[in-house]
């Protein structure tokens, strides 16, 4: 049996896209060449690696077993090539994921610093925590920065920065001048919330909703900016990250209602347990860890 790196590269690319045509475009090969390479790999291994569900190819048990080993080998090969590159700096494009609060309000500062110091040109995907974890589990991302909880057994989450969730309202809200509010006082309010499976929605369901004797769901929006603008316009109140709302709180477009309890939120670095850490990935993780005490990044109160 003589497997080739090209066969493994074709396999890994098909696994990411689930489609021969898309994989062929990514590899700059014909669809026929990609299909032939996969068939030869399956012949050599004496087992199919995908379930053919037209037009998609989904990894079967054998394919899922091969995927982390193939991804690791291909990444190690990239590291070997980098060892002999003229600049000897980390290279290769990292595939980073970020949930919306981090991606919109924290990651730009982080990437500006890491690009200058580390020379990393990452490809960034911004999505909700649930979808990012799904992508990590399928090796579609190298790592992610999330604010929600990880429920996937194949992923490893490392605590990173601290954020805080606030109940925000438009200026002049009837409860704004109260000294201390219990959650039960918010039961009759209309709530503007993020979509299901977002980190902030999950925290609302776990920590806020059970305390409300009654509550009125209002708009459901899939971006933080849309949620905050809706609150500004008087369409309801919301449960929002301090990190996301800081500018609007500072200039008075939003106010934080004075609750009797606080809602801290853990931000985390997360990756697949079987993910090989390339030089670039190791450098970026180290850089992220070094930002814990950086006031510009963590934005403490």
What are these regions (language model features)?
Residues 106, 255-297:
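A late-sequence structural motif
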Residues 8, 44-45, 66-88:
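Alpha-helical linker/hinge and terminal dimerization helices associated
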Residues 128-133, 137-141, 146-147, 205-206, ...:
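Hydrophobic hinge/microswitch elements
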Residues 154-191:
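Flexible hinge/capping segments at coil-to-helix
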Residues 42-59:
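A short LG(V/I)-centered, amphipathic sequence patch enriched
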Residues 91-153:
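Central regulatory/effector-binding core of bacterial HTH transcription factors
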Residues 189-211, 278-281, 285, 295-299:
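Secondary-structure junction motif
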Residues 12-30:
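Short helix-boundary/capping micro-motifs
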């Amino acid at each position: 049996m003589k497997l080739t790196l090209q066969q493994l590269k074709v396999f890994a690319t098909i696994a990411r896209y689930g489609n021969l045509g898309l994989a062929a475009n990514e590899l700059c090969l014909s669809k026929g060449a990609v299909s032939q390479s996969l068939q030869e790999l399956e012949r050599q291994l004496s087992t199919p690696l995908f379930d053919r569900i037209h037009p998609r190819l989904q990894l079967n048990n054998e394919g899922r077993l091969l995927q982390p080993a193939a991804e690791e080998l291909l990444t190690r090969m990239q590291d070997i090539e980098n060892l002999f590159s003229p600049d000897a700096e980390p290279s290769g494009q990292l595939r980073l994921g970020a949930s919306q609060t981090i991606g919109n309000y924290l990651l730009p500062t982080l990437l500006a610093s890491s690009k200058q110091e580390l020379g990393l040109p990452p490809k960034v995907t911004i999505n909700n925590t649930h979808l990012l974890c799904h992508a990590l589990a399928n090796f579609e991302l190298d790592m992610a920065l999330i604010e929600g909880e990880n429920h996937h057994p194949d992923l490893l989450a490392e605590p990173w920065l601290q954020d805080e969730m606030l109940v925000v309202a438009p200026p002049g809200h009837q409860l704004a001048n109260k000294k201390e509010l219990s959650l039960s006082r918010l039961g009759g309010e209309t709530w503007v919330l993020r979509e299901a499976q977002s980190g902030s929605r999950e925290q609302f369901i776990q920590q806020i909703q059970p305390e409300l004797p009654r509550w009125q769901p209002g708009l459901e929006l899939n971006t933080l900016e849309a949620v905050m603008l809706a609150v500004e316009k008087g369409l309801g109140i919301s449960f929002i990250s301090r990190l996301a709302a800081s500018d609007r709180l500072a200039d008075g477009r939003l106010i934080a209602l004075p609750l009797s309890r606080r809602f801290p939120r853990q931000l985390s670095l997360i990756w697949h347990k079987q993910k090989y850490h390339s030089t670039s990935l190791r450098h970026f993780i180290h850089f992220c860890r070094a930002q814990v005490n950086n006031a510009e990044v963590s934005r403490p109160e």
